[in-house]
Structure formats: C-alpha cells, structure tokens
Amino acid sequence: MKIYTSVPRDLTRVKEKLLFNLTKRQIVCFGLAAVIGLPSYFFVKKSAGPTAATLCMVFIMIPMFLVAMYEKNGQPLEVLFKQFVQAKYLRTKERPYKTNNRFAVKKNPSDSGKENFIRHMKNKLSKDSPQTAQQSIPYRKMYRDGICKVTDNYYSKTIQFKDRNYQLLKDKEKEMILDDWGSFLKLFGNSVEFEFSFMSLPEDKDLTKNKLHIPIRFDGLDKLREEHAKMLKEHAETANKGLEDVWLLSFGLEAKSLKEAKMKLEHIEKEVLDSLRKMQVDAVSICGAERLKVMHRMLHIGDEKRFIFDWGSLHRSGLTTKDYIAPTSFKFDEGRSFQMGANFGAVSYLSITASELNDEVLKEFLDAESSQIATMHIQTVDKATAIKMVKRTITEIDRSKIEEQKKAVKGGYDMDIMPTDLSTYGKDARKLLNALQSEDESLLLVTFLIVNTGRTKNELEENVSRLRRIVQQKDCELCRLDYQQEQGFMSCLPLAHNQIEIQRALTTSSTAIFIPFTAQEIFHESGAAIYYGVDQVTKKLIIADRKRLKAPNALIVGSSGSGKSFKTKEEMTSVLLMTNDDVIVCDPEAEYRPLVEKLGGQVIRICATSHDYINPLDINMNYSEEDEPLALKAEFIMSLFELILGGSEKMDAEERSIIDRCIPEIYKKYFAEPIPENMPVLEDLYNQILKQKEEKAKRLATALELYVKGSLKVFNHRTNVDLKKRMVCFDIKDLGNQLKKIGMLIVQDVRFVSR
C-alpha cells in the first residue's frame, strides 16, 4: 500500500507588499519608468506633438513594466535575459576535446592577425566562458582520497549507497523507514549543501560479462556452461534494459584550506555512513578515481569508451584528471538541449505542484527505459530564518485578505468570499509554521533536475515526453530549462555544486517522500552464485550464493504445473556448472533420472526387487567433523531402530545401551583393516544383539529380523553402487510404504558417508 504525505504550497510565490499593494521591486521599476518616461513625453511633445510623445513614452516604459511584472520559475526578467544573452552570444557554443599540457601546441602559426584579434576580443567578452570540453567540467582539482576542490573555497565528497528492502514491507515498517529517512535529511546543517544523484547508466558490458562468466573445467560439461553463460547474458540485457543504477550522495562546504575541508568533510562522512548503516543501507565512501569513473560514465553516455586512469600517469603525461573523463565535445548551441559527443541530452527541472505525493513517486520517475540522471540538490534553511520567513508570509497573506475585504465592502458583496488561492496559501502557511515550531520539521530548499539522453534528437524528445507523462500523472510538471542546459547538466555532476537558482521550499517529511528504496538487490559476485530469476519489484537479476546468506535453506512452493520441478532441475544444473558442490537428489517420483544421466551422475534405484544396494552401516573417517565417527554413527543407528520399532513409544535407556554396546563390536574388524569386505551389514548387528543377555535385546533383534532375513532385506547388503560422483540420485518411487521412511533416513545418512 502506498503512503501519502501532504506537500506545502510554494510560499516563495507570496511577495512582500509595501505601498499600493505593490512589491518593492514593482515600486522601483514603476518609479524608474515614470522618471524616464514622463520627461521623455514632454521633451518629444514640444517637437513632434502629443501622439508621437505618447508612443515614445509607452515604448520607454513598457520594458520597465515587463521587468516589474514578468517572472518565470521564480526568476525575474533581467535574469532570464542575462541567461539568454550568455547562452546565445557570449558563451562558446562548440567546445572540442583539447588538451592543454606541456606537449600541446600553444599557437597556430597559420592564424592571421585578424583571426587572433577576433579570438582575443571574444575571449575578453566571454571571460568566464569555457573554450574546451575539459574546461566545461566545473571543478578545479580531484584528490586521491575523494575530496574534490570545486571552486577556490568550496570542497565536496561523495558516498555511494545501494537499495534496501522497502516496497514489500508492511505499512508500519514503511512509515518507520520514512521517519528515519526524514531524520537523515536533517543531518546536514545550513552550511552544508548536499546532492542526491540517481543515475540509470549503460552497463559496462565487459564488467557484466566478467560477472556472468563461467570458467571452463574440462569435465565434459563445458558446452553446457557456454549455453548457460549465453542465457545469463540474454536475461541480463532484457531484465535490466542494459542499464545499471548508481546512487550517490555528495556533500560540500566552504573552507579556507584543504586541511580544514578534509577535517569537516570526514566528520560529516562518518555521520552519514553511520546513519545509513543504522537504516540497513549499504554505503561506502568513494575515492577520487571512483568519482572520476562515475563522471566519465555520465559524460560518455551512449558510447563504449572505457575509463583508463592512473594517478601516476598524470605527472608523466602532463594531463589533468579532466582529460581522462571529458567527452569528445560539448555543443550548447540550442536553448533547450545540448550535444555531448555523438549523443543528445536535455535537462529539465521538476516543478512540484501536487498537494500530496506518495512514496513511490521517485521509483516511478527512475523506472526509465533509457539512460537518465535525476538529481536533488538540497539546502537546509536555518530554523530561525525559516520561521521568520513563514511568519512574514502569513503577514502578507493577512494583508492581502484585508485588501480583499475592503474591496468587498466597497463592491457591496460578502467580505467572507476570498480568492481560493489566498485561503489555501493561508492555511498552508499556518500549518507549515506549526510544523516548524512544534513537530520538529525543518525547511529545505530543493532543486530537482532530470537529464534525459538519446542517440538522436527524436529519441531524446521521445524519452522526455515519456517522462513528462509520468510526471503529469503525479500532478507535477516537467519543465525544460531554457538557455541553462549547460548549467543544468553540470549541476547534475556529483560535485554538490548547484548552478540552477530554481528552488522549491519543502519540509523534511515532504522531501522524504522522494525515498529511492524499493528492494535490496541480490547480486553476489562470487563464482558460486547462481541465477534464480528476475526480481518482480526491481526488474533486476537475482544471482545469489545461498551459502553466503544468513539462512541458506530454500523451499520451492507453487501450484500444480507452475514449474517447481523445472526450477529444481535448473538449480541442480547451475550448481554442477558453477560450483564445486555435490548434488544429492532424493527422487520420490522417478522424474530426475534423465537429467542426472545427462549430467553424468549416478542414479540408484532403491526397492525390494532392485539390485542397487546401499549399506546403512557404511562409515569412514570423514563421517564426523569432530573425529568421532562411531559416536555419530551410533546416533544414526538408534534413529533407524526407532523407525523399525514403530509406534509412538521411543526406545528406553536400556535398549539404547544395548545398541550402543553392540556397535563398537561390529566395527572392530573394519577399523583393524578398513577394506570394503570388512564393512558390517545389518545382519552383523542383528547377530551381535542376539548375543546380549537382556530380555529387551530379544525384542530389538525380533524387530530387526524383518529387514535382515525377511521380505524387506533390501538394506542388508554391502554398497555396490558408486557414491563418489558429484551428482547422485536416489530413486525411491517403488520403495513401498513400509520402507519409505527408513529409505529417506538412509539417503540422508549417505551424504556423510560418500563425501
């Protein structure tokens, strides 16, 4: 069941009014319009008449009115205009991959003086504009320990974390995890910026191939291993859609030096790792090379260029870390998309307009059919500042209500009739204030960015449209960043550095609803891991080594015809192909013989008329792990006698003592000379019991007689079948009801003797 939480309205839309129900910005702009427009009117009127003067005044004042009134995504007109001019005219649009080391050519002698002058002027105008693909990547230096110097005084670090079980839990357990996630979001103070990166990136085909590789063993089954590996590869491509999920948490702060930054970041890192582990989330801090590898994958989405990097090569080659991760080129020549190498991309932001959201919203956003990157930049607002801001908003709303009531009185209609938005904003603001003051909530400023990619423009637009439909179903909007594609994409790199000023104020509980967890992935990277299928929640492969789990046992259940036997046979085959383990099959329906024989195993048919014999008294020195094989064998023989005697009565102490006394006697000859001919059989035990003087010995011997001299003497023979093969199947279909339980017990014991 989905868990819903309410989302407060965006109170940043409520502006503080000063005079005439106008904001400070509007008063300044209207004042400037009047100061410039009115003198222009009188000046032009003298020479061109009132009509021309009026037109002139209107043309002069309209831009100021637009600056005062127009706003998009919380950004005023002059900011939007600045972004347009920079993207269209000042910043370099095409940026090729170009190294700038000691081996690079510093000057092209064929350049003319005019070309040099034009280039110089362009560089002067675009002082901060990157000229190459490397310069476009917005960080200064990456250190070995994972700390990145992003700007002169800003440093960041990154933690990688994995999924955990969530979607299939009960509602109360989900609510507890949501509370823990909300508390985790409050871990960062207002001086720390943090960024969640949820990436669906193309799988590393070589790495996936190595993970699913099955080494050959020259045991006659290598052809099956090749087929099995091919099957695994096909399942991996269809199940994961060729994508791999990478989840990162990056955090950064201002510091005067690297030493100060390292001390602060390591302290935060320890708190973050401890908190995540308490939530049963696997997390690890990644080093500089791993951060570079992740960025390389982001910057090379769609191509198969491998990341090859060595810290020692930096000094030898004169290159920088950016030279190892940069794409072949960047092209930011369009306002609503960009090109990275041969692939296209588009950055959008999530406009959260819904009144409530459920805990599966992020999962649905991330359930992509193509590569995409979702990023949440979060900045905590100081509690006192947040309360002050909300109180000011409530004051503005109350002032607006008073103005509306005055209008109602003048207009002669009911003063209780208020605009819907005004009433809703007022309720939400008071609710938010109460949450901040009484419910231990914090106010967070969130920037939610999503990068879609495609090999062609059409594919890109299809991917964006598909995501937009999902977003609209949640009563939210996916809005493309206009003329901020570069800043948007660079903000999605795991550097905890946000260049987009579009923010949404949310409480910790409403931010926590964007919880990423679904179900813990089970993918053991050991040679003994076996393919079990596809997780129906995560749609990922389940490849597990059961011996590494806390409870390695398994039970296959299902209705008739659902494939229980098929699944069992599949796992048996996988065990033989991928591990060194032995397989022992107890077959009550005689259905596994063809498979066992095909895999080179041994089938043993056990019944009253069979000539395949198993001696229940077989023993060897490996029978017990504690160097007491006879003691363990005695326990087995006593269990066998309890089944032979039948009924609800168990053997008493006297009967146990009789059997325990006889067992060492029948094994003396074998231990003196351990050859198969000296191994005792049930008849030897029967004869030894008859030698005992107690009355109860006679009872034990009489019960055993049926299995020694009677019609059920199938187990009174020495073993004549090969039990050393890796796969042994015991066919007990025709064993009969009288021997069924005894046969099952003996089969269980054989696994100790034959190994």
Give the role of each language-model region.
Residues 46-61:
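Hydrophobic alpha-helical transmembrane segments
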Residues 567:
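Hydrophobic positions on the alpha1 helix immediately C-terminal to the Walker A/P-loop
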Residues 141, 147-151, 157-166, 171-192, ...:
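P-loop NTPase motor domains
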Residues 556:
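Hydrophobic anchor at the beta1->P-loop junction of P-loop NTPases
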Residues 57-61, 65, 73-78, 89, ...:
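Extended, folded cores of ATP/NTP-driven motor/assembly subunits in large transport
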